[in-house]
Amino acid sequence: QAPSDKVIPIISQNEVRNPDGSYQWNYETGNGIKADETGTLKKGSKPDEGDFIVAQGSFSYTGPDGTAYQVQYSADDENGFVPQGAHFPTPPPIPPAIQRALDYLATLPPTPEARP
């Protein structure tokens, strides 16, 4: 698709930054894109770790085919960026025989590490 020379207006845009490191922003464009995010500053749990941001947000837009897309996400030091959306592919179900085998294996005691 060729780039458009059409200027898309910003309908609304807000941003708040707080002294404690937390923030909130959102915007909406003339072509229906919306986005928002909130974040807080979290102290590292170890003395050698710095502070980091924990964020939650969402964005939505309409694709070229007219389909509405919405994504919610979180981001932190433990899980990284974790998006969720109804349009994301999902894995196929695990066949029952394989699931039974996995369940059985989970009940077994740990085995010693293999030695070279």
From Swiss-Prot:
Q: Which InterPro entries match?
A: CHIT_BIND_RR_consensus, Cuticle_Struct_Prot, Insect_cuticle
Keyword Glycoprotein assigned to the entry: answer is yes
Per its UniProt record, what PROSITE patterns does this chain match?
CHIT_BIND_RR_1 (PS00233), CHIT_BIND_RR_2 (PS51155)
Q: Which residues carry this modification: Proline amide?
A: P116
Described function: Component of the soft endocuticle of migratory locust.
Q: Which protein, by its recorded name, is this?
A: Endocuticle structural glycoprotein ABD-4
What sections of the sequence does the record tag as coiled-coil? none
Q: Which residues carry this modification: Pyrrolidone carboxylic acid?
A: Q1
What the entry lists under Pfam families is as follows: Chitin_bind_4
Explain the post-translational modification: 3 variants exists that arise from a sequential glycosylation with N-acetylgalactosamine at three (ABD-4A), two (ABD-4B) or one (ABD-4C) threonine residues.
> What is the native source organism of this protein?
Locusta migratoria
Region spans: Disordered: 78-97
> Which residues does the record list as glycosylated?
T90, T107, T111
